[in-house]
């Protein structure tokens, strides 16, 4: 609970506020989650509880919803912005089958944190690799990574916001779990391992992914400052 409300409701209300024209659905695997959302008028699709990843769950849910293009905001991203959603849609305006967002790291502590996923991209803005480890890693600097080095180099945090074509979702759920995905516990690596591309946009919008109790405290502070509510 954050501010007396479940995090899921913060995310739901935020999306409705910043993207009111979206056909908004929630993929859930527990009637308690459905019942949490229903009083606010949010629609849910019940899915199996044994999916390997959130993307597998989205693939099942979209077989009910039937969207050609799916924007997936994970339930730990309560500060998603309208600009981020527009950026995702822009990335999907071309031939891309999947897209996601990243933002610059500001501190060495966050860059080292395994709960904050890193992404390295090629010159065309396509993901090369995602990792919980600090990447790129400065060989000649070793453990001497500081805030100044992080700010001066291409150190990007992956955000839990995706866009997919429906056909990519169908193909994703049919793929076996990849070896890298199993090691890092990062579902997007299944796409990389299969030889497919992920377009990555870099957002400057401030955001806090809530993955730990410390993140929840940071989000509560942002809400008190007026920067995190819907």
What are these regions (language model features)?
Residues 21, 67, 94-98, 196:
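Short, high-confidence coil segments that cap the C-terminus of an alpha-helix
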Residues 24-26, 99, 127, 198:
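Hydrophobic/aromatic residues located in beta-strands of well-ordered beta-sheets
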Residues 28-29, 80, 164, 211:
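A conserved hydrophobic position in a structured secondary element of the catalytic/binding core
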